[in-house]
């Protein structure tokens, strides 16, 4: 997984590509590289570590009209200079950058080795450029050789290629992996992420799966399918801003994005709610008739959002909800009943496992598919029957904060909309719920401005934490435990509070930190019972509870109080508490908050 960035135009390509790579670094950051042409010959520079290392290695005297670059998150071959992209052929005449996994790379590699090709890396990517180079030597036809190469690849990929015989041309292609073109005046950008070139262009074309593009200086983009049939593509121009890439005085993107949550909530509520009901635009054109079950499919944090949605929607809309991990869904031959609705959740809209699950849904049933994502230009948004956007703006921190809580809010609103459509919720209860959610932005600001940021973990030297919650709080505990793993590198596990006695209580010893979420009023006393169980075994209990439940201090070692709220808003506020706790513990442990080891923001490979 990685970020791809390329430039072709009248300006100096090298600093533009280095700048673009810096903006893509959150997608992969174990190594980086750039390729360009200097005096008619290919020039390639690579560096292990952040893009700043690459910038230091590249001379500022290099001027070129074309360049391609890459930030890497290793999937084939360890992080190293020789495995970093761009990769070149044996003659160093062409260079290629690639995102994805080539599933038949071993077979292709053996075929090329039999023809005398010597490989210089452990990656599947090098197979592509060596295969292309062999074909180009035979045909001397740049575009035909590229098409022929692409058709031999199995797997998911996006790539960009340059050849020293054609200094005015860049080639790029996409197959089940994102690639976006930005169009300026006599210039074009190639990127894995639209935000990397928005400073220069808001006019875009997105390569669909199975498409390649030929870019030439001063000429319009030529788009083809892999059989070289010409495709006419529309240019989409959007309002664009770079504000999201500015930390705005915060030390970390994660902290900035934590504080942006109230504004995100306000945007969602403005688009979906009015008075005591819903706006006409919310789910406009998407019928909720005859839906008899929901299948929610997602990965990571989005899966936890779906898990909460199951609890909420079943309780308020009286409809069965099944939640699936996307990476498992496609392999287990699930039964999809008639009149089911599939809901696929992905922040980026490019999560490979989730897109694969979408393909599986299409094969298994005629169920309609609703998408929930953050990126309008994404593959998910283009392939589902209807898409709800979480309006979170660019999220740079690898550990999701505002995107996750935006998913929660939108899913809760979807549950209320469904309950109202099915006439299983009293109008008074609906009005109270909507008002409770409308209170959420101000309650979030109140909490973010409270003493929560003074909290420090007294058990920071412990290597294992347990999270407990019941009902709505259990999925939120799952997310809190994930956050601790992601950025503090601490082993953390979440359990339903009632399950402790069925096994996990064996892990409790004196001083074991147990973080208990006591935010669901309907099971508050039951949750207190779980606290008593672990306290009897001398666990160290950190209790999170509403402000009105200060009696929790009598049975816990530490307390974090959350503003009182409506039952449907509470999971979101308790989520934010978990985000702040994980952030604080990461600082205490000295880990990298925005770029945790081994993780990438957008998981575009299976």
Swiss-Prot record:
PANTHER family from the UniProt entry = GLUCOSAMINE--FRUCTOSE-6-PHOSPHATE AMINOTRANSFERASE, ISOMERIZING, GLUTAMINE--FRUCTOSE-6-PHOSPHATE TRANSAMINASE (ISOMERIZING)
Q: Name one GO cellular component term.
A: cytosol
Give one GO molecular function term.
Answer: carbohydrate derivative binding
Mind listing the UniProt keywords for this protein, alphabetically? Aminotransferase, Cytoplasm, Glutamine amidotransferase, Repeat, Transferase
Q: Which reaction does it catalyse?
A: D-fructose 6-phosphate + L-glutamine = D-glucosamine 6-phosphate + L-glutamate
The Glutamine amidotransferase type-2 domain, residue ranges:
2-218
Q: What is the lineage of its organism?
A: Bacteria, Pseudomonadati, Chlamydiota, Chlamydiia, Chlamydiales
**Matching InterPro entries:** GATase_2_dom (IPR017932), GFAT (IPR005855), GFAT_N (IPR047084), GlmS/AgaS_SIS (IPR035466), GlmS/FrlB_SIS (IPR035490), Ntn_hydrolases_N (IPR029055), SIS_dom (IPR001347), SIS_dom_sf (IPR046348)
Q: Where in the cell is it found?
A: Cytoplasm
Q: What is this protein called?
A: Glutamine--fructose-6-phosphate aminotransferase [isomerizing]
User: What are the BP-aspect GO terms?
Assistant: carbohydrate metabolic process; fructose 6-phosphate metabolic process; protein N-linked glycosylation; UDP-N-acetylglucosamine metabolic process
Q: List the disulfide bonds.
A: none
| HAMAP family found in the cross-reference section | GlmS
**Which Enzyme Commission number(s) are on file for it?**
2.6.1.16
Q: Note the Pfam families from the entry.
A: GATase_6 (PF13522), SIS (PF01380)
Q: What is the source species?
A: Chlamydia trachomatis serovar D (strain ATCC VR-885 / DSM 19411 / UW-3/Cx)
Q: Which residues form the SIS domain?
A: 278-424, 448-596
Gene that encodes it: glmS
Catalytic residues, per the record, are: 2, 601
Quaternary arrangement and interactors, per the entry? Answer: Homodimer.
Where it mainly occurs, coarsely classed, is: cytoplasm
Function of the protein: Catalyzes the first step in hexosamine metabolism, converting fructose-6P into glucosamine-6P using glutamine as a nitrogen source.
């Amino acid at each position: 997984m990685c970020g791809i960035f390329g430039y072709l135009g009248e300006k100096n390509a090298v600093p533009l590509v280095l700048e673009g790579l810096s903006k893509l670094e959150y997608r992969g950051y174990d190594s980086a590289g750039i390729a360009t042409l200097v005096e008619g010959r290919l020039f390639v520079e690579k560096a292990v570590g952040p893009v700043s290392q690459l910038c230091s290695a590249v001379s500022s005297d290099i001027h070129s009209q074309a360049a391609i670059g890459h930030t890497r998150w290793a999937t084939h071959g360890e992080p190293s200079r020789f495995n970093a992209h761009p990769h070149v052929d044996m003659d160093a005449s062409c260079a290629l950058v690639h995102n994805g996994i080539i599933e038949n790379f071993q077979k292709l590699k053996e075929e090329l080795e039999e023809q005398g090709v010597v490989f210089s890396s452990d990656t599947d990517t090098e197979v592509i450029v060596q295969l292309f180079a062999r074909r180009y030597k035979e045909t001397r036809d740049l575009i035909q050789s590229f098409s022929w190469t692409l058709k031999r690849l199995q797997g998911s990929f996006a790539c960009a290629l340059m050849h020293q015989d054609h200094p005015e041309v860049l080639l790029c292609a996409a197959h089940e992996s994102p690639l976006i073109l930005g169009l300026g005046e006599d210039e074009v950008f190639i990127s894995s992420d639209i935000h990397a070139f928005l400073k220069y262009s808001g006019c875009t074309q997105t390569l669909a799966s199975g498409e390649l593009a030929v870019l030439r200086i001063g000429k319009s983009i030529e788009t083809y399918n892999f059989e070289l049939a010409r495709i006419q593509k529309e240019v989409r121009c959007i309002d664009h801003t770079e504000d999201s890439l500015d930390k705005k005085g915060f030390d970390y993107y994660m902290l900035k994005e934590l504080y942006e949550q109230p504004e995100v909530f306000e945007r969602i509520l403005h688009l979906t709610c009015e008075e005591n009901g819903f706006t006409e635009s919310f789910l406009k054109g998407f019928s909720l008739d005859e839906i008899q079950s929901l299948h929610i499919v997602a990965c990571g944090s989005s899966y936890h959002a779906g898990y909460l949605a199951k609890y909420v929607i079943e309780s308020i809309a009286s409809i069965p909800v099944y939640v699936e991990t996307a990476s498992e869904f496609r392999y287990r031959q699930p039964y999809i009943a008639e009149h089911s609705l599939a809901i696929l959740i992905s922040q980026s809209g490019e999560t490979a496992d989730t897109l694969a699950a979408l393909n599986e849904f299409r094969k298994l049933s005629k169920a309609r598919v609703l998408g929930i994502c953050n990126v309008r230009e994404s593959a998910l948004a283009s392939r589902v029957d209807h898409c709800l956007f979480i309006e979170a703006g660019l999220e740079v921190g690898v550990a999701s904060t505002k995107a996750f809580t935006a998913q929660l809010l939108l899913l809760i609103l979807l549950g209320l909309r469904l309950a109202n459509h099915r006439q299983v919720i009293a109008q008074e209860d609906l009005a109270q719920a909507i008002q409770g959610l409308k209170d959420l932005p101000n309650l979030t600001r109140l909490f973010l401005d409270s003493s929560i940021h003074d909290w420090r973990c007294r058990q920071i030297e412990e290597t294992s934490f347990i999270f407990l919650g019941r009902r709505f709080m259990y999925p939120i505990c799952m997310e809190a435990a994930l956050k601790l793993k992601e950025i503090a590198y601490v082993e953390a596990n979440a359990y339903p509070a009632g399950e402790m006695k069925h096994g996990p209580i064996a892990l409790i010893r004196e001083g074991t930190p147990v973080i208990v979420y006591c935010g669901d009023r309907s099971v508050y006393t039951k949750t207190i019972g779980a606290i008593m169980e672990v306290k009897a075994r001398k666990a160290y209990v950190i209790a999170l509870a509403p402000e009105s439940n200060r009696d929790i201090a009598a049975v816990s070692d530490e307390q974090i109080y959350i503003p009182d709220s409506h039952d449907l808003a509470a999971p979101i506020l308790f989520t934010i508490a978990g985000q702040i706790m994980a952030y604080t513990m990461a600082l205490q442990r000295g880990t990298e908050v925005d770029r945790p080891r081994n993780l990438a923001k957008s998981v575009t490979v299976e």
